[in-house]
Amino acid sequence: SDFIQTDSLEKYALEIAATGELVGLGAYRDMPEGVLVYVEYIESAPHSNPTLAGRRKYKGIGAALLAYGIQLSIDYGYGGAIYLKAKTSEIREHYIRDFGAIPFSRLDPYLLLIDGEAARELFSQYLKEE
């Protein structure tokens, strides 16, 4: 697809280290004008996507992919700030409740920001500082 071919996105696959099993995909856009990283796309593999599978094989895939966006933001010198657009109202509420996301735009209630303490907490749960 054209989306996968976009050079302006950093694309990552999340795998289980022991088996190489693919469990999620993420695409991230550097937004220097906003001093943050936009999480363009994150998706769990079908077997771990609660919408598709009901019972998930693995939990925390989306959170780990968000944490990776926070890592990119830190690497770019943005302090961990990320924003994203929730696909559904349920996912929006999940990000607000569980990850400390805050609405980013009055025009689009699905645009959310994860920054500051919320970003540090999410990062520390899933990734380690080097």
Task: Enumerate the language-model features and the residues they cover.
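Non-catalytic substrate-recognition and accessory regions of acyl/acetyltransferase enzymes
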Residues: S1-R56, Q71-Y83, K87-E90, R97-E130
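Glycine-rich acyl-CoA binding loop
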Residues: Y58-G69
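Conserved short alpha-helix immediately C-terminal to the canonical SAM/SAH-binding motif I
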Residues: L65, E90-I91
